Curated annotation (Swiss-Prot):
UniProt xrefs under Pfam families: Cpn10
Major place of residence: cytoplasm
Cell compartments where the protein resides: Cytoplasm
Keywords: Chaperone, Cytoplasm
InterPro entries: Chaperonin_GroES, Chaperonin_GroES_sf, Chaprnonin_Cpn10_CS, GroES-like_sf
CC annotations in GO: cytoplasm
Entry-linked PANTHER family: 10 KDA HEAT SHOCK PROTEIN (PTHR10772), CO-CHAPERONIN GROES (PTHR10772:SF58)
Protein name: Co-chaperonin GroES
Function of the protein: Together with the chaperonin GroEL, plays an essential role in assisting protein folding. The GroEL-GroES system forms a nano-cage that allows encapsulation of the non-native substrate proteins and provides a physical environment optimized to promote and accelerate protein folding. GroES binds to the apical surface of the GroEL ring, thereby capping the opening of the GroEL channel.
Record family assignment: Belongs to the GroES chaperonin family.
Domain of life: Bacteria
GO biological process: chaperone cofactor-dependent protein refolding
Length: 95
């Protein structure tokens, strides 16, 4: 992937949507819920503080993160779907 986020932005590869229910029924594309977690694939340099210092990003490539249902902007690069979001849109790092 040739995509480098700027400032405090993060690129996340969303987890795949569930294909079937726990009971074994297949879910059509129109009924699938958007996943709210994924893997960070790239991180910007960070945000500038009011005093001019560069604040380090708390997430890094490879982290599994939890984010809001409507967070980020969807982009497709080389046939793969990604979300570009601000670091503040990420709720937690999954351990």
């Amino acid at each position: 992937m040739n995509l480098k986020p700027l400032a405090d932005r993060v690129i996340v590869k969303p987890a795949p949507a569930e294909e079937k229910t726990k009971g074994g029924l297949y879910i059509p594309d129109t009924g699938k819920e958007k996943p709210m977690y994924g893997e960070v694939v790239a991180v910007g340099a960070g945000k500038m503080s009011d005093s001019g210092q560069l604040l380090a990003m708390p997430v890094k490539a490879g982290d599994k993160v939890l984010y809001g249902k409507y967070s980020g902007t969807e982009v497709s690069v080389e046939g793969e779907d990604y979300l570009i979001m601000r670091e503040s849109d990420i709720f937690a790092i999954l351990a």
